[in-house]
UniProtKB/Swiss-Prot annotation:
Superkingdom, natural source: Eukaryota
Organism listed in the record: Mus musculus (Mouse)
Gene: Tacr2
Membrane-crossing residue ranges in chain numbering: 33-56, 70-90, 108-129, 150-170, 197-218, 252-272, 291-310
The keyword Lipoprotein is annotated on this UniProt entry: yes
Protein name: Substance-K receptor
Lineage, top ranks: Eukaryota, Metazoa, Chordata, Craniata, Vertebrata
Membrane topology: Multi-pass membrane protein
Glycosylation, residue list: 19
Transcription recorded as keyword: no
Length: 384
């Protein structure tokens, strides 16, 4: 995604790939560059640390290894990669207007970080679909561990396929002594191919996934808030179970809304720019791009914060992960949250448990047919 008229940076939706023939010198005062560098450094540190911690919390604690949380791992990994590669190298490129990293890394930067962006949005969509099936259709078969891994593999393959055109047409050019990593679209008279690619990507990785997630979470919300725990069960584990489901929906809706807000200005920047390319030659456009790019990349650091604030198990996990910090002292309750698996069936009789699991959408197909209560995955949600 191009920073300005003279540069085509290595993110998705490159602004001036094949049409950047002139060079405009973009420079900024040292203090301004230092401020931007500090802002991007803070973003990368928070995003990488937060998402790495989320991955550790889930993988290191068996209770957290649920179908939904495996998708959250995939989302966290994608966000971590976006922060480490997109935010870091594209900031250097956009702020200096020179590609320092060679031709091989130019291809890599136009493939892997772009793939990670696709994986991020599709992982959120998979989480919405999984929760939709679990809550709205609790008697339908749930994804098994092998099926979940297969879905994750398909997500990565589809993301690679969508990112491959930008990688395929990547090339290194030297313009007035400055090395550029550009995406040179073939036979792109009038920028029609560029605009088409922008629109296709916008629809496939922004508009359609958001529509699907909005519809799924709307139905989930209506389903959960319509159901009420019977009076004789309106306390203890059953009520906590329903409340946990509602908190999960709130957390994931916040994740989706945050993503939508962060990325919309960035997508519009490039779509609108195809209609008025001379704007990329304006001196101020570098600052506009750096601001919009920071906003888009900042979406990678918010999810761990949301999980920590809205889910007690992730909050306990963060305390354990940062137990060396003054504010991260874990308690015995925090350890139990991540290691102890309560048995709902010990608290209530089987038929009442079965009814409650149906209402909260956590009954698997085998439980519905055999009257069995499942393990950690099928009790109080371990996810956010």
């Amino acid at each position: 995604m191009g920073a300005h008229a003279s540069v085509t940076d290595t993110n998705i939706l490159s602004g001036l790939e094949s049409n950047a023939t002139g060079v405009t010198a973009f420079s900024m005062p040292g203090w301004q560059l230092a401020l931007w560098a500090t802002a991007y450094l803070a973003l990368v540190l928070v995003a990488v640390t937060g998402n790495a911690t989320v991955i550790w919390i889930i993988l290191a604690h068996e209770r957290m290894r649920t179908v939904t949380n495996y998708f959250i791992i995939n989302l966290a990994l994608a966000d971590l990669c976006m922060a480490a590669f997109n935010a870091t190298f594209n900031f250097i490129y956009a702020s200096h207007n020179i590609w320092y990293f060679g031709s091989t890394f130019c291809y890599f930067q136009n493939l892997f970080p772009v793939t990670a962006m696709f994986v991020s949005i599709y992982s959120m969509t998979a989480i919405a679909a999984d929760r939709y099936m679990a809550i709205v259709h609790p008697f339908q078969p749930r994804l098994s561990a092998p099926s979940t891994k297969a879905v994750i593999a398909v997500i990565w393959l589809v993301a690679l396929a969508l990112a491959s055109p930008q990688c395929f047409y990547s090339t290194i050019t030297v313009d007035q002594g400055a090395t550029k990593c550009v995406v040179a679209w073939p036979n792109d008279n009038g920028g029609k191919m560029l605009l088409l690619y922008h629109l296709v990507v916008f629809v496939l990785i922004y508009f359609l996934p958001l529509v699907v997630m909005f519809a799924a979470y709307s139905v989930i919300g209506l389903t959960l808030w319509k159901r009420a725990v019977p009076r004789h069960q309106a306390h203890g584990a059953n009520l906590r179970h329903l409340q946990a489901k509602k908190k999960f929906v709130k957390a994931m809706v916040l994740v989706v809304v945050t993503f939508a807000i962060c990325w919309l200005p960035y997508h519009l920047y490039f779509i609108l720019g195809t209609f008025q390319e001379d704007i990329y030659y304006r001196k101020f456009i570098q600052q506009v791009y750096l601001a919009l790019f920071w906003l888009a990349m900042s979406s990678t650091m918010y999810n761990p914060i949301i999980y920590c604030c809205l889910n007690h198990r992730f909050r306990s996990g963060f305390r354990l992960a940062f137990r060396c910090c003054p504010w991260g002292t874990p308690t015995e309750e925090d350890r139990l949250e991540l290691t102890h698996t309560p048995s709902i069936s010990r608290r209530v009789n089987r038929c009442h448990t079965k009814e409650t699991l149906f209402m909260t959408g956590d009954m698997t197909h085998s439980e519905a047919t055999n009257g069995q209560v499942g393990g950690p995955q099928d009790g109080e949600p371990a996810g956010p």
